[in-house]
Amino acid sequence: MSKQVKLLFVCGAGLGSSFAAQMATEEVLNKNNIKAKLDHVDISTAASSNVDVIITAQNFQKQFEKFNIDSEKTSIIYLKNIVSEKEIEEKLIPVLKERKFLD
């Protein structure tokens, strides 16, 4: 990997589920030897964040569609199960390859 990926985990309050998703994603990153900067925030803060990938629960999709997030700069991954390492890996790895964070 040529550069460190910046991942942002988002939930309503920026505390519970976003932190749980962050912990599950750390396992996936470690397993795949991916270096990343991780943070978790509430949904209102996420709109103005400068990150490579936002990871959030599927139930926030309608709210994110209202934000003006540049898809060229930031990919958004919606999860059905925010603590499923399998789902995180299945959705995150292709995005990282597409965005040239992985070969």
Where are these regions (language model features)?
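Conserved acidic residues
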Residues: D52
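Short, polar loop motifs at secondary-structure junctions
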Residues: D42-I43, Q58-K62
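Conserved active-site segments centered on acidic
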Residues: S2-T45
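Glycine/Thr-rich phosphate-binding loops of Rossmann-like dinucleotide-binding domains
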Residues: S17, Q63-F64, E87
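A short, aliphatic-rich alpha-helical micro-motif
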Residues: A47-S49
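Ser/Thr/Gly-rich flexible loops in soluble cytosolic domains mediating phosphotransfer, phosphorylation
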Residues: T74-D103
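Short, conserved catalytic or adaptor-binding loops enriched in Gly and charged residues
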Residues: K66-S71
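Structural signal for conserved beta-strand scaffold positions within catalytic alpha/beta enzyme cores
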Residues: H40, T56, I77-L79
